[in-house]
Amino acid sequence: CMGYDIHCTDRLPCCFGLECVKTSGYWWYKKTYCRRKS
């Protein structure tokens, strides 16, 4: 469930234990995705 194409919402069980991050890249501007908490 991790990747730039994943819309991170609290309803997604696969995002449990992960952090939601807003991208700042050009192609994925302000799109959210899940990643492991650093």
UniProtKB/Swiss-Prot annotation:
One of its GO terms (molecular function) is sodium channel inhibitor activity. The modification Serine amide is found at residue 38. It is found in: Secreted. Expressed by the venom gland. InterPro entries: Toxin_22. Keywords: Amidation, Disulfide bond, Ion channel impairing toxin, Knottin, Neurotoxin, Secreted, Toxin, Voltage-gated sodium channel impairing toxin. One of its GO terms (cellular component) is extracellular region. Pfam families: Toxin_22 (PF08092). Disulfide bonds join 1-15, 8-20, 14-34. Belongs to the neurotoxin 14 (magi-1) family. 09 (magi-1) subfamily. Negative results: has no effect on lepidopteran larvae when injected at 20 pmol/g, or on mice when injected intracranially at 32.8 nmol/g. Insecticidal neurotoxin. Shows competition for site 3 of insect voltage-gated sodium channels (Nav). The presence of a 'disulfide through disulfide knot' structurally defines this protein as a knottin. This is Mu-hexatoxin-Mg1b. The lineage of its organism: Eukaryota, Metazoa, Ecdysozoa, Arthropoda, Chelicerata.
